[in-house]
Amino acid sequence: MLRKIILGASLIMAMTLSAQSQCKKGDCPHHSWMESNVWNNGWNVAAHSSINAKEFHEQYEKNREVWDAMFAYLAKIDLDTLSLGRIDIVPGRCYIKMSEYVPRESEKVNIEQHHNWIDLQYTLRGNEKMGYAKDVTVKHEYNPKKDVAHFNSDNVTYFKAGPEAFYLFFPTDYHQPSVIDGEPVTSRKLVCKIEYIH
C-alpha cells in the first residue's frame, strides 16, 4: 500500500514538473526540434502538435538507437499492406502492432496511462479521435504486468486521428485512444511501444 502511495505521489510530481517545464510553441527549442523532422529517419509522417515536444526530444536523446531503429523500419515498409499483429523492432525495448477494429463511443473506451512504455499511435484510416484527459480519478489501479492503469474524467480534449500525423503518449499523458468520430467504419491503426527511460 505504501509503495502504491509513493509511486502515485512520484508520478503526480513528475506530471506537475512536466507541465511546468513545457515551453510555448514558437519560442521553444523542443518544438523547433520536433518540427524539423531530424528525428524521423525517413518516415515522412508529421508529429501531431499536441505532443509534449520536450518529453519527445528528451526521450529521443536518451534512447536514440531505439527511436532510430523504429522510424527507419516504418520508413521502409508498406503500412497499408503490413500484416496484422506484432513485430519486435528491438526485442524487449520496442515493438509495433497493426490492428483493425471499429472504434467505440467515448463512454465505452478507457482512459489509460502507462508507466514503462511510450505509445506511438498512428491511424491510417477510419473515423476516430484521440483524447487527452485531465482531472482524472482512478477506475482501475495500475497493473504492472500490463503496464496500464485506467481512469475516469469529465475533462477530455479530443483531436482528429488520421494519416497526416501520429500521436505520442508518455507516462504523464492520460489518454483515450480509438474513440469514434463519425460513421462507424473499420479503422486501421499502428501502435508502436517504445521503452520509457526514467
Annotate each PLM feature.
Residues M1-C28:
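Bacterial Sec-dependent N-terminal signal peptides
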Residues C28-M98, K108:
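A short, N-terminal "cap"/entry segment at the start of jelly-roll beta-barrel domains
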Residues N116-E128, P144-K146, K193:
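Short, conserved beta-strand element in jelly-roll/cupin
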Residues I118-Y122, Y158-F159, F166-Y167:
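His/acidic/aromatic-lined binding-pocket segments of jelly-roll/cupin-type domains
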Residues K160-V179:
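Conserved metal-binding segment of the jelly-roll/cupin
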Residues F166-L168, P184-H198:
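A short hydrophobic beta-strand segment most commonly corresponding to one strand
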